[in-house]
Each structure stands twice: as C-alpha cells, then as structure tokens.
C-alpha cells in the first residue's frame, strides 16, 4: 500500500509549478485590445490619443478579471490584511505622510532626470513627456487618499518609500530599503517612458493601413502582422509598468540588485542601445534591415509564404511572452514567477524568439555591397548580440533564484520544458565531450 502511494505521488519537479498569473487575464486583455482595434480601423482612430485608449481597453478587462475572477487582492503575497479591522487613521497617518514625502521626492527626482535627459525632449519621447505632465497633478492628489487608505490595511506599511521619507526627515532608516525603493522606481521611470513613447507608432502601423494596402502581397501582409504583434507587446508592457500596485498583487517584489543585470538590459534600450545606427553592435550594415528577407527571396513566392509565416510565428511568441504577464510585465524586476504559456516551453521565450527573428528577417550575411568582410562582420556582430541576450537571461536567473518558487520552476523546466530540456542536455554534453577529447589526447 505504501509503495503504491509512493508510485502514485508525483515526484518533486514532475508537476509544473503554479504560475503567479492566470492564463485568463492575458486572454481578456487581448479581447479588449482587439475590440478597440476593430473599432479604430472602422473609424480611422489612428492617432496618439487612440493609442492611449488602446492601453485602457487592454488594461480594463485585465483589472476586472484580476479582482473578480483571480481575486488577486486577497492573495497573501500582496501584504494586505482584509480580515482584521483597519488601523485607526490617527495611528497610521504619520506613516502615510512620511511615505508621501518619500514618494513625492522620488517623483520629483524622476521629473528632474527627465528634464536633464536631452533625448526625452525629442521624438518619440515627447508623447511620454506630455502624458506625464498631464498626469502629474492628479497623481499627486490621488496618492494622498490612496496611501491613507492602504496603510490602514497593510501588514507592514513601512516600505522603501517610508524609509526614504525618514531619510529626508532626519529619522532612522534602513539603507537597503532605500536602495531597493530607488532601484524599483528607476526601472519604472526609465522603461515606462520608453514603452509609452513607442505605443503610438505601433498603433498607427496597425490601424492606419487600409485592407487593400495590407493585402498587396505576402510581404506587406507579413509586415503588418509583425507590427500588430509588436503593438500587442508594447501595449501590454505599458499596462504592466503603469499598474505596479499591491491591491492587484502586481507590485514589485524585488528589483535586480546586480550591476551586470542592469548593464546587460540597458544596452538594449535607448539612449544606451548599442545595436542600432552607428552603435558597435549594429549587425544591419549594408543589409535591408528586417525587411531583407522579402528582397532576397522575392523571386520565390512559396518560400516567401513559408518564411513570412515563420517570422509572424516568432513575433507572436515574443508578444505572447509579454501577454502572459497580464498586468505584471516589467524588466529587471521580480513580480511573481510565470510558468504557463510559452514559459512552459522555455525560461526565456521572448529572448529566444526575438534573436531567431533577427537572423531570419535580416539575413545579415546577405549584403548589398557584395563585400565578404561585411557579411562576416554582420554575422559575427549578431552572434555577439545573441550573447548579450544570453547574458541578460543569466543575470535575470541569478536575481530570481533567490525565490524558492523560481528554483522549483527552473528545476521543472530543466527536465520538462522542451526547449530548456534540450539546451540543458546539450550543455551537459559539452563538458563531457571535452573531457573525452582531453582523455583521448593524453
């Protein structure tokens, strides 16, 4: 009997760990966004304001689903005590006002850095700056009742903002809590400005083209579908950066504390990006960019269809990796461990699909100069770019490994996620093969 029970009980690592986000929340976000895309294409709503409505159309159903279906506000991980009587307001008010001092100082510092960064006053960032300016006063006003209400319910209201407020007011504080607070808000301030800036462009690329323009040929259709996938990606990502809130259990648990992780991430985004223009990692020199495949395979219709389908599939996986987060997407942070969707295939679906997409779309070895040196150089540089994303993945894992939930997921993925399992086995074979060669050489 005992033996039968042991056989029936799943071994540790055989069952996929539970995902911190449900599959349903991303699906309802897709439905809301798709509905607005249909309306916008009918009425020609292709401008920046319509793109903001797209963010709202994506966010609203996800927030409703999160609260009414997933009941994330009741999750123990958000630190809110709904069962006990709230603290008396006079008892929690001092904590709230100290926290407000820290929070407002943080926002003021971010605004100052926006003013100092010249690139923020050029396109496409001007849209973000205008939106932040419009939101500033309402946000400051709304933060007062929000914190007064939240601090009466939080099990531990003295977070990083409170410790920063104590620092500013000359009270005792914990230095590491201040550092963690500043890391979280640096990430949010940097990436929200970028994501919001590129939302209108992707939105225009999806809504503005007519059906006749889209259906001109397979290359044009593929290009439109790829832009649509990126529109989904940036819209969901923007929602994620906006709604870092504890009542939604979408707060930041921790920000990556490693300098290597920040360096690997920041060189992939402006103004630090090294892959574009005259950057040292520009692998597109003398190519036709990400539309190169359409040129080089132009005389082969069947190949164009097959190649375009693969490119759309890769971009869809990339977008899916963001959609799976629901309202929690964020770079360089831990906001809950995902194990469903494309994360059941590999630990890094976005990086993998993106890098394969660059190879297949750009074809860096095909150059217009006819110079073999340019082909070799582009190929080598794209390999280096792949290495940068491998570096990003490893630094992210180093950060997330502090959470037992991620360690369980990583152990499961190594044996059961198809792509991760394959790569893990290949990795195990390399040193073994090297050892065999060394023994043979002896």
Q: What is each model feature region?
A:
Residues 2-332, 336, 360-442:
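Membrane-anchoring alpha-helices and their flanking helix-loop junctions
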Residues 335-343, 352:
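Alpha-helical membrane-protein architecture signal
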Residues 348:
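Short, conserved phosphate/pyrophosphate- and ester-handling motifs at nucleotide-, phospho-/glycolipid
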Residues 354-356:
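Transmembrane-embedded, aromatic-rich helix segments that form part
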């Amino acid at each position: 009997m005992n033996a039968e029970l042991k056989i029936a009980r799943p071994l540790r690592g055989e069952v996929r760990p539970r995902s911190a986000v449900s599959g349903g929340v991303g699906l309802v976000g897709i439905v809301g966004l798709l509905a607005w895309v249909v309306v916008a294409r009918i009425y020609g709503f292709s401008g920046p304001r319509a793109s903001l409505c797209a963010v709202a159309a994506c966010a609203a159903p996800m927030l409703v689903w999160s609260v009414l279906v997933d009941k994330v506000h009741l999750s123990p991980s958000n630190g809110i005590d709904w069962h006990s009587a709230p603290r008396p307001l006079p008892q929690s008010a001092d904590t709230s006002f100290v926290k407000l001092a820290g929070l407002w100082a943080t926002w003021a510092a971010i605004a100052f850095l926006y003013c100092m960064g010249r690139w923020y006053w050029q396109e496409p960032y001007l849209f973000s700056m205008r939106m932040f300016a419009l939101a500033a006063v309402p946000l400051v006003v709304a933060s007062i009742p929000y914190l007064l209400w939240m601090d009466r319910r939080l099990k531990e209201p003295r977070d990083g903002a409170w410790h920063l407020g104590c620092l500013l007011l000359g009270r005792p504080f914990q230095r590491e809590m201040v550092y963690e607070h500043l890391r979280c808000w640096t990430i949010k301030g940097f990436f929200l400005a970028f994501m919001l800036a590129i939302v209108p462009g992707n939105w225009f690329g999806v809504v503005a083209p007519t059906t006749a323009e889209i259906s001109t040929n397979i290359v044009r259709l593929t290009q439109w579908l790829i832009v649509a996938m990126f529109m989904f990606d940036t819209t969901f990502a923007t929602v994620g950066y906006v709604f870092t809130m504890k009542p939604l259990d979408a707060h930041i648990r921790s920000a990556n504390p490693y300098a290597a992780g920040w360096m690997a991430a920041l060189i992939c985004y402006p103004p630090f990006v090294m892959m574009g223009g005259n950057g040292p990692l520009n692998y597109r020199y003398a190519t036709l960019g990400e539309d190169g495949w359409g040129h080089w395979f132009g005389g082969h219709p069947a190949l164009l269809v097959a190649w375009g389908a693969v490119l759309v599939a890769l971009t869809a996986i990339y977008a899916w990796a963001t959609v799976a987060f629901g309202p929690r997407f964020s770079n360089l942070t831990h906001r809950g461990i995902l194990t469903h969707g494309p994360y059941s295939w590999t630990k890094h679906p976005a990086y993998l699909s993106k890098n394969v997409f660059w190879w297949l779309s750009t074809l860096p070895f095909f150059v217009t100069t006819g110079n073999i040196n340019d082909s070799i150089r582009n190929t080598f540089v794209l390999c280096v770019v792949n290495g940068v994303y491998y570096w990003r993945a490893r630094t992210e894992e180093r950060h997330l490994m502090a959470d037992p939930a991620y360690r369980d997921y990583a152990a499961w993925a190594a044996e059961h996620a198809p792509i991760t399992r394959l790569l893990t086995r290949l990795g195990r074979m390399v040193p073994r093969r090297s050892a065999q060669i060394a023994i043979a050489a002896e």
